[in-house]
Amino acid sequence: MNALSIVNKVVTLVSYNMHKTRLNAVTACVKSLLNGSAATVTSIGRGINAKAFEKHRIKRADRLLSNPHLVSETPLIYASICQLFCGNTTRPVISIDWSDLDDRKAHFLLRAAISLKGRPVTLYQEVHCNKTKEKPATHKAFLKTLHAMLPSNCRPIIVTDAGYKSPWFRAVRALGWDIIGRIRKPHLYSLDRGDTWQCIRYLYTQATCRPKRFDNSQIVRSNPFACTLVLFKQKSKGRHASNPDGTRKASKRSKAH
């Protein structure tokens, strides 16, 4: 099945209550993006496959993206997507992460995506500014909305990166879900039910490509959080941060010496 057939099928399934004219406009804009158009009003409009003049195609995309009815239907569309991709499984693996939306670092995307055969499919996402980015209240509201959209029998496994800390873990566990995350310094950990605490970096030297499991562990000495720690070091993939011109990034301190 080619991409256009999949788009037609999925869009129809998740927007069955949408007005036909608006549904056709959504499908046309999605196909425009699928054919390589940038995610801007002008580019989407120019990429619409229709006999209308270019200015009318751009106006069509502009009307759709500013349509208040489409905005009000967005939660229902996300809920339908959750039902479509999570309805047949009770333990989906859902990745949640932040990403930048623009080069100015002014807008950020918080996205929940299900992993299907190595491909992420977005279930729900929100756009935030610097004032609400990575705030506990933002995370709790996001989880509450996602919980309401998922099927009632769904108990997902949430996967997050090292940027999320114990308040996030507690919020996920409060919903009855399981979570997999990365712990990095300066977190403190205990392997003996709180009798001895050490910085997590002391475990780094023991890490190998063979996973080690530590049951009945705790993190955060001031407010212990019970968990299972797994120590694992993956083989280096040779990735390096790059500057906009493609050269390898270097710290100011290394340049001074």
Q: Predicted regions span which residues?
A:
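Residues within the helices of the helix-turn-helix
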Residues: T42
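Single, function-defining residue in the core of a domain
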Residues: M1-A38, R46, A50, R57, ...
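Active-site-proximal, Lys/Arg-enriched surface segment
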Residues: I58-K117
